[in-house]
Amino acid sequence: MTKGQLNIASGECLIETVYRADGALERMRGLLGRERLAPDQGFWIAPCNSVHTFFMTYSLDILFLNKEGILLKIVSELSPWRMTGMISAWATVEMSAGQARALGLSIGDKLVWRAC
């Protein structure tokens, strides 16, 4: 995994620590077996257009982005043992439940992952 930040296109940092899944195994594992994300943490998976919370013990907010980083869909507080997806998405960002709302994210926002 590579550590970076999630920024809005203007350059403002939204989430200080966002890990990017670099390989197929990391993408498949996702957050399984990992501790709950803190409010200042996230997990970027690309390519990815669906996620599940099977075997997880906590809820997540899920962002679906296209290749340009445009936010297409927000799934708030996806409970354990659920699935969600979006055919046209290229990447997902997983974050702690409630963070999408707390950050004021909206459909159409342009998001960028930047390495630290």
What residue ranges belong to the model's regions?
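Compact, glycine-rich, soluble single-domain proteins
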Residues: M1-C116
